[in-house]
Regions:
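Long, low-complexity, compositionally biased intrinsically disordered regions
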Residues: 1-138
Length: 138
């Protein structure tokens, strides 16, 4: 599953602008708010707080953990646009009101701005992270 082309293009433009000037121009910030709505500003706050961690195992499997504003850690999968937070389940999956939640948007913005924390874990640690998420849900 992919984001709409306009969203993909906006994230590409943000990445290019940030690489050149180390900031995101106002027009792209407005575009972010237009496309992603109310989750744009909170997502930028998460990026500013360096709340996004890229977790990588030796086999190359990657997931992201985002420390939410509530202090809870959410697991995000950028490859399939999925987050374990309740807002994702409700606004994105059930109601189709949003493209994604603030946590996944923060992951994409952190990637674009090179603002991800990095964490190398063993395969066993990665498995434990994934299993812990399943227990939280069930």
């Amino acid at each position: 599953s992919t984001l709409p082309a306009v969203a993909e293009e906006l994230l590409r433009e943000i990445k290019m602008a940030f690489q050149e000037t180390s900031q995101v121009p106002d027009d792209l910030l407005l575009g972010l708010k237009f496309i992603f709505g109310p989750c744009a500003v909170p997502a930028l706050d998460l990026v500013d707080q360096r709340s996004v961690t890229r977790v990588r195992s030796p086999s190359g499997r990657i997931l992201y953990q985002v420390l939410g504003s509530s202090g809870k850690l959410y697991t995000c999968y950028s490859s399939c646009h999925f987050c374990t937070c309740p807002a994702f389940g409700f606004s994105v999956l059930q109601k189709s009101e949003s493209l994604l939640c603030k946590h996944i948007l923060a992951v994409y913005l952190s990637q674009a701005m090179g603002a991800c924390q990095e964490l190398a874990v063993s395969e066993e640690q990665l498995t434990n992270i994934l299993l812990a998420e399943e227990e939280d849900e069930g």
